[in-house]
Amino acid sequence: MVTPISDMLRLWTIDSGEEKKESGTDRDLIPLATPLMASGYTPSGMEFLTDKMKDFNMVPYSAASAGIDEVPRPLEAGGAVSATLVTGDLKLGAVGTVTYVDKDHMVAFGHPFLDKGSSSYFMHNSYIFTVVPSRNIPFKLGSVGAEIGTVNEDRGSGISGLSGKVPESVRLHSSVLDEDTGRTQSLNVRMVQNERMLPMLSVTSVYNNMSNTLDRNGEGTVSLSYTLFPEDLKKRPFTRSNMYWSSKDISERSVDEMYNVIRILEQNRFEPYKLRDISVDMKVTKDRKTAQLLDASASPTVVSPGDTIYVRARLAPYRGEVFYKDLAFTVPKDQPLGTMILEVRGGGVVPLPYLIQQQKYNLTDEILERIRTYKDFNDLFDKLEKEDKNNQVVVEILDPNVSMISRDEENGTKAEIQDKRPSQNPDYLKGKKGDGKEGEKEEDSPKSSVDTDYVVYGDGQFTFQVMAPEDRDRALRKLAKSNQKMIADMKNEGKDSISGKDKDGKKEETKEENGKKPDTDKKSGTSYFLMSDSMTRL
């Protein structure tokens, strides 16, 4: 297929409005995968990049650099040029032949690159090593050289560019510390300002820096923090930190969250959130820094709206010593009287009752994301930034309709799946108030959290009775009397306990001697629960 030069030269007139319609191109043809030249990527970085590029119908090839790559050269017809997506410590772009040059303007390729119309890619010199034959489509294998301008049009007849003009871009700085070796690596790149491609370009760059620093694959724990700076200085930067453990590929696991956050913010339906800078800092170790939530206790068990519940969680690190974390949870002032169920969990854990309901309705993560509603951009922004962290212990109210605790139980020592009548949406997608209608903000469920130095797994629930203040005081006085009687009984039995005999002279056999744990004392005013199996949120 030969593209007439007249069609290509029309690309220069599109900005002025003199020519809006192209001819001589066939939009019904099936697009072939676009080959890209990549330099600066590690072998595992190339594998990751190749996998992510499939969604964009692109195939990256590792390309060596030529000795003259970093020296800017004027373009000339018949020479090579690159339309580039990433530049800096990494380079990623498509190379092709320059068709015509007029001063600082040029047209090239004779076919589309991404076919995005008016665009803003980096324009680079290029050096072509050879032409790779292929039954599908032969392509030029070359290097991406020095930056010289902007590719401003990308249409069916080819690309056009302007030398000396700097395109819009997003800067990314990534710093990775390998705590095992003490090695630190930094990476600086600029990426095209394209809201659909930016999430992929960002995480493949960060992944490559992680791969380059660790120089290994496999398990590890990463502590990361990142900030997204918007182009509009009136908008708030997005800052978040988190912690991840992976037994397979910590490099890939470490960039999952950032990919989703950038995608959601850049592609949100409310208002533009164009980025100008991304800063990422990571600390990685091969050690497994995880902790299992064993159990928890809370007091008091009888409360009124506005009261404070004190929770102590017991956790066991992987091959480490058990430790405790204390939290205070305030009962909402508008909490209905009756049974209230609290969930204690790791910050990245999906409670088992919710997971069961998700499976019951056959809801995928994509469906869940579509069901969730937000009032406006600020609501979306705040929810993303305040999302629970994997290294937190979280206490929150659990919907009683999906709890695994029997309503007949006075404390949380037993787990039982509740029957539930089907509804249109699972209850865990509904806020405390509001019906999820468009434009109506759903209130977040009250919660409390505390940070740890570990990725926390496990969850469980226990119940509390919410009463009016006068009823609460009466119930607490009754509990206090029961406690006093219990203490007196223990003192009276103390002498017999020393001899190991009961009142009839027979030796007592405790539940611990039988290999059983003593039952929780329901009169103590402290509630305990057993842990349920759960699933870590991906």
Model-based region annotation:
Residues M1-L538:
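Terminal presequence/propeptide segments associated with secretion/organelle targeting
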